[in-house]
Curated annotation (Swiss-Prot):
Source organism of this protein record: Rickettsia bellii (strain OSU 85-389)
HAMAP family: Ribosomal_uS9_B (MF_00532_B)
Protein name: Small ribosomal subunit protein uS9
GO biological-process terms attached to the record: translation
Keyword Ion transport among UniProt keywords: no
């Protein structure tokens, strides 16, 4: 029986307790994406919709595709769900928001704006990150429409089966 000897170029260093403690204490914080005019930028996605969100300190004005939030979304419940991150972090009427949304329908665009606002809020104040994560606003909803398969009526619906 032959034995193989493996040569390694790496020299193992003795473990340093201080280095290990320093590694454990480093916590991931979201990167600041602030532009020159003091706005926080984030992108949100939901289904086929992509929202680009700019957040800056202000009076609580929300503009979506050059329209006010009430003009863009007809339903009051949609407006309330978009503003949920502010009620959760208790920052109502403290930030101005400008969004551009493309693709998808109204529901997907609403979810994309909500996701983008949450990410921008988490960048503006690091202590909001844990609150928004716990509320489920920072996780991207990855559910998308399943594609239609050939030989079938829809994605899952098949033609009626006849035994005889």
């Amino acid at each position: 029986m032959t034995t193989l000897k493996i040569k390694t170029d790496k020299v193992e260093k003795p473990l340093n307790k201080e280095a290990l403690i320093a590694d454990k204490q480093t916590v991931k914080t979201p990167k600041e994406k602030m532009d020159n005019s003091g706005r926080f930028y984030a992108t949100g996605k939901r289904k086929n919709a992509i929202a680009r969100v700019w957040l800056k300190p202000g009076k609580g004005q929300v503009i979506v595709n050059k329209k006010s939030l009430d003009q863009y979304f007809a339903s009051e419940t949609q407006v309330k769900t978009i503003l949920q991150p502010f009620t959760l972090t208790k920052t109502n009427n403290q930030y101005d928001i400008v969004c551009t949304v493309r693709g998808g329908g109204i529901s997907g665009q609403k979810g994309a704006i909500l996701h983008g606002i949450s990410k921008a809020l988490a960048q503006s104040a690091p202590d909001f990150h844990a609150v928004l994560r716990k509320g489920g606003f920072l996780t991207r909803d990855s559910r998308v429409v399943e594609r239609k398969k050939y030989g079938q009526h829809k994605a899952r619906k098949k033609t009626q089966f006849s035994k005889r």
